[in-house]
From Swiss-Prot:
CDD domains for the chain: PHD_Cfp1
Name of the protein in its database record: CXXC-type zinc finger protein 1
Coiled-coil intervals, chain numbering: 422-474
Highest taxon, organism lineage: Eukaryota
Residues making up the signal peptide according to the UniProt record: none
Taxonomic source organism: Homo sapiens (Human)
Gene for this chain: CXXC1
Keywords: Acetylation, Activator, Coiled coil, DNA-binding, Isopeptide bond, Metal-binding, Nucleus, Phosphoprotein, Transcription, Transcription regulation, Ubl conjugation, Zinc, Zinc-finger
UniProt binding sites for Zn(2+) 2: 181, 184, 187, 203
Basic residues: compositionally biased ranges: 321-334, 346-358
Residues carrying N-acetylmethionine: 1
Amino acid sequence: MEGDGSDPEPPDAGEDSKSENGENAPIYCICRKPDINCFMIGCDNCNEWFHGDCIRITEKMAKAIREWYCRECREKDPKLEIRYRHKKSRERDGNERDSSEPRDEGGGRKRPVPDPDLQRRAGSGTGVGAMLARGSASPHKSSPQPLVATPSQHHQQQQQQIKRSARMCGECEACRRTEDCGHCDFCRDMKKFGGPNKIRQKCRLRQCQLRARESYKYFPSSLSPVTPSESLPRPRRPLPTQQQPQPSQKLGRIREDEGAVASSTVKEPPEATATPEPLSDEDLPLDPDLYQDFCAGAFDDHGLPWMSDTEESPFLDPALRKRAVKVKHVKRREKKSEKKKEERYKRHRQKQKHKDKWKHPERADAKDPASLPQCLGPGCVRPAQPSSKYCSDDCGMKLAANRIYEILPQRIQQWQQSPCIAEEHGKKLLERIRREQQSARTRLQEMERRFHELEAIILRAKQQAVREDEESNEGDSDDTDLQIFCVSCGHPINPRVALRHMERCYAKYESQTSFGSMYPTRIEGATRLFCDVYNPQSKTYCKRLQVLCPEHSRDPKVPADEVCGCPLVRDVFELTGDFCRLPKRQCNRHYCWEKLRRAEVDLERVRVWYKLDELFEQERNVRTAMTNRAGLLALMLHQTIQHDPLTTDLRSSADR
């Protein structure tokens, strides 16, 4: 139908050609020009292409056209009409309604006289009427005859446009009512009262006494059988110009007004009564057949057709009926999805019931007390509940208590008579764990003593006087050409500054990694173990040793007159009692000796604490096992039968 102007299809026949620069160029449109550099639209009948500017059709307008025919084709064949795409479901419903209307002899549609109020509400619509107003339909239809509507018909058309929200005055007793009665035919049709939701009307007691339809208002005889002519809504009266209603014409409902029903309504024969036209949710359609069955008493309290099981009928009892709640009407699409979900759930429930009957045939007669097994409770003769051995919880508790009183004393006596090897092994294991705990505590006390001794040595060393002698500086200038490589970065360094460089290089690389835990360390009696600095980004506490953490601690600035103070040793381990008295800045042999000694003591203390924690966990597990071994549940479930006490004693002769 429509195409890009750069690649049109040349028609096979019915076009002239002329030569330009020695080449044959096809010509198009009513202007007979070969121009293809603009928007073009093609006829779906003769396949001729036309420029949009020549026929006054833009590219945006063409997107809404489904089938387009040129003027010549429409003149030759009046049946050809331009068809448009429908963007909304209301437009589609309007098109179908227009296509089902009767036509006159010339093929044109018969249109009623447009109502000014309705046209004002519709505005610039997008339906078929708006398309005809723009001149996009076929111009060769016979002009319709002007139709004059009676005042009653004009009033009915206006009343049909009133929405459901406008059918309430808000002042009468029915409008102020907030609960459904649950007894009328409209309530029994609702889903919350177990109905099929076919009529979809408000409770009769909640129908407005001023603005609601007369057939929907409450009247005492609504629950009694009525004639079909009284219960069914009357069809719309035909217009004066129509002689007979066409078969395709749909009859609509009218709203019965006070005083106008008896004078203007003409009864139609049963043959002329057709199915009412389906309306939207706002019009609240009424199914005539179902409504007639309701009024005739077909849906009484004991004969509801949608009752598939006797278990689903207790809602009719006033004591068990739920209180009615005001339910808002939602859109049709949402209702359809809800109906699909309910139907799917009902099918699933039916299949599940069928499977349960095949898998558990004994449940089929669960309602029959004679088919149920007897309760196993002591002295109880009542039938057991389905899928249970007892008729109630009390019977089960009584039987369990009697079983404990009967079996437990004998099991306790057997437990006391025969020795338990696992119990003896547990006692020995507890003794060994306690010895290890005692040794760990002794080791911890020793490390605490060493910690305080080291602090005293460091304090005494700082009180020494600085002394610069040539003997201590001997060998510092030797081997200046010798180089070693750093273990962290691999760079060659001088042995004189090797310790200083390696310590700083290690701290730089170590600070790039974090070691943390979600909880701080709290150990009674322990001081200066972990760093425990909180990191708000990772929400963790640092778990490095406090004296070695390069991330959260820095070496203090050394003054010029501070002494080194490192204790001097002989043969590596033997202390001489003297201290290094070189200035701390110049001593390359004892770099950071205080930090390393403190870290050594703290690391040993941490190891002892870890050992104690492991021993506490082992003790807890052993005690839990020993407690559960002679408990009520273990004695009731397990039993050891000792047939020959002499040959089955697993203890060794030394243990006896």
